[in-house]
Design a protein with these regions (language model features):
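C-terminal accessory/tail domains of diverse enzymes
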Residues: 7-194
């Protein structure tokens, strides 16, 4: 799994990361073996976009995370709240955000590209979290797009183009994601029709 240092991130940035992660999950799972989507070790984020948007403090963030995960608030490493693709229990316990979606590998190409995706989700989430606190007149066009894309309540409004462009994935990484999605396309098409 990938851990990203989050000791200097608080509810605003973590809220942004949850919003980005919530929307990005469908494309993340589509590039991974089907077993990852059904695994108990990297479950989907359990909270809604609407509930994430209601986070107004660090305590709201903690309450939403543990309540949505139906887990107790604890410093125990093996707390049930950790078994999500984006593990925010690690932020409380270790000071990092853990990305658990990807299966284990020692393939350097997979590792490099997956790290880039995780770093991009983190960077985009931080930007979004800060943009949500700004006066609307001070927002850049990109910040406006982030707010528009990641605060819509419905998942079907988030496109693959949004995923690639808002995460600012370079051609090499987006090509890798395309290749992985093609590899698991048959499963993805079937699971979308169920």
């Amino acid at each position: 799994h990938i851990h990203i240092d989050a000791r200097d991130l608080f509810y605003k940035e973590l809220k942004g990361m949850l919003l980005v992660g919530k929307k990005a999950e469908k494309f993340i799972y589509s590039m991974l073996p089907p077993s990852r989507e059904t695994s108990n070790w990297c479950k989907k984020l359990p909270m809604s976009v609407e509930s994430i948007l209601c986070i107004k403090s660090d305590s709201d963030f903690i309450d939403l995370w543990y309540d949505s995960c139906e887990a107790s608030r604890s410093m125990d490493k093996y707390n049930e709240a950790r078994y999500h693709g984006m593990n925010m229990h690690a932020r409380v316990y270790l000071g990092s955000v853990e990305f658990r979606y990807h299966s284990g590998t020692n393939n350097p190409i997979k590792i490099k590209n997956w790290m880039y995706v995780c770093q991009s989700i983190t960077r985009t989430g931080i930007m979004l979290g800060k943009a949500l606190c700004k006066d609307k007149s001070a927002l850049t066009p990109f910040e406006k797009r982030l707010i528009d894309v990641y605060t819509k309540p419905y998942d079907n409004e988030y496109t693959y183009k949004d995923f690639i462009e808002t995460l600012e994935l370079p051609l090499e990484v987006s090509g890798y994601v395309d290749m992985r999605r093609e590899l698991f396309k048959e499963h993805y098409i079937v699971s979308q029709s169920l």
